């Protein structure tokens, strides 16, 4: 009986050991599986990182090759361009490709030469829109041209007046004095007292230049030029090919003769002391003073 008891205990002990061994094996299997999963995960991660590194490597290599090509292209000083390179056909024939820039330059030079030749061959054409000078004689001159011409003809008129004195002549001075009712001829423009001498002289210079341009242009229909009577209105601008400077125009404007009124207005008449304080004066003395004030010094004959 004791043997059976001892064997039974031994069997139980062996069974427990077997169970423990089996449980340990199962645990080891589970741990192994976990380790395998972790290994697979790490392997996949490493492969992905390797692919990314390979892609970055390829990009860096391409960038280096492009930099080398660009540096060599710049180092040559743009002597060899991709357009100038020879292109070989599959049959083995060589075809030269001319650069587009050279073509454009050649076309531009040819066009410029053609235009220069055409301009040299064609004679200078005159404007056909100008009016006939004979017709322009019939039409009255403009006010600006009248003032310019009158400025030129003014000394001649004064000389005629000095040679042929009118009824109102001062015998002591030999100067023709206009009466109170007399005025400038209709060919001149009456300007108010507000007009300044600088503006009048500037207008006279501008009118002289315009009259010169109109006189020098020939007519397209008849081929005749404007008579020399109108050419005299050009004044000192005749024979000048360059535009005058501002200082020259200013000096001419200062030296230019201008007309306001042969008879100054009543508002500009100089009053005597007697007239200011209300004392009357004789009409004869007053008329003599008015005649003296009305004749400016610049209109006296030389």
Curated annotation (Swiss-Prot):
<feature type="compositionally biased region" description="Polar residues">
    <location>
        <begin position="178"/>
        <end position="199"/>
    </location>
</feature>
<feature type="region of interest" description="Disordered">
    <location>
        <begin position="110"/>
        <end position="229"/>
    </location>
</feature>
<dbReference type="InterPro" id="IPR031525">
    <property type="entry name" value="CC190"/>
</dbReference>
<keyword id="KW-0175">Coiled coil</keyword>
<feature type="region of interest" description="Disordered">
    <location>
        <begin position="278"/>
        <end position="302"/>
    </location>
</feature>
<protein>
    <recommendedName>
        <fullName>Coiled-coil domain-containing protein 190</fullName>
    </recommendedName>
</protein>
<feature type="compositionally biased region" description="Basic and acidic residues">
    <location>
        <begin position="207"/>
        <end position="216"/>
    </location>
</feature>
<dbReference type="Pfam" id="PF15768">
    <property type="entry name" value="CC190"/>
</dbReference>
<feature type="compositionally biased region" description="Basic and acidic residues">
    <location>
        <begin position="158"/>
        <end position="171"/>
    </location>
</feature>
<feature type="coiled-coil region">
    <location>
        <begin position="14"/>
        <end position="72"/>
    </location>
</feature>
């Amino acid at each position: 009986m004791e043997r059976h008891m001892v064997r039974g205990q031994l069997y139980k002990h062996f069974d427990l050991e077997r169970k423990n061994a089996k449980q340990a094996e199962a645990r080891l299997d589970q741990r192994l599986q976990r380790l395998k999963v972790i290994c697979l995960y790490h392997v996949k991660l490493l492969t992905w990182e390797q692919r990314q590194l390979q892609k970055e490597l390829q990009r860096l290599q391409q960038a280096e090759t492009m930099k080398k090509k660009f540096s060599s292209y710049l180092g040559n000083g743009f002597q060899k361009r991709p357009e100038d390179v020879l292109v070989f056909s599959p049959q083995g024939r060589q075809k030269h490709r001319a650069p587009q820039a050279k073509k454009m330059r050649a076309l531009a030079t040819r066009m410029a030469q053609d235009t220069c030749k055409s301009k040299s061959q064609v004679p200078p054409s005159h404007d056909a829109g100008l009016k006939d000078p004979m017709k322009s004689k019939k039409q009255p001159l403009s006010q600006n041209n009248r003032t310019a011409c009158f400025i030129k003809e003014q000394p001649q008129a004064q000389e005629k007046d000095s040679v042929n004195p009118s009824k109102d002549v001062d015998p002591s001075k030999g100067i023709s004095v206009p009466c109170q009712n007399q005025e400038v001829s209709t060919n001149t423009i009456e300007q108010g007292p507000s007009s300044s001498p600088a503006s009048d002289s500037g207008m006279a210079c501008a009118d002289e230049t315009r009259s010169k341009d109109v006189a020098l242009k020939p007519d397209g229909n008849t081929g005749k030029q404007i008579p020399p009577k109108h050419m005299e209105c050009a004044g000192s601008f005749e024979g000048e090919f360059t535009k005058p400077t501002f200082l020259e125009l200013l000096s001419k404007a200062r030296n230019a003769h201008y007309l306001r009124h042969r008879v100054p207005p009543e508002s500009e008449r100089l009053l005597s002391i007697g007239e200011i304080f209300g004392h009357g004066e004789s009409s004869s003395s007053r008329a003599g003073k008015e005649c003296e004030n009305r004749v400016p010094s610049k209109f006296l004959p030389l």
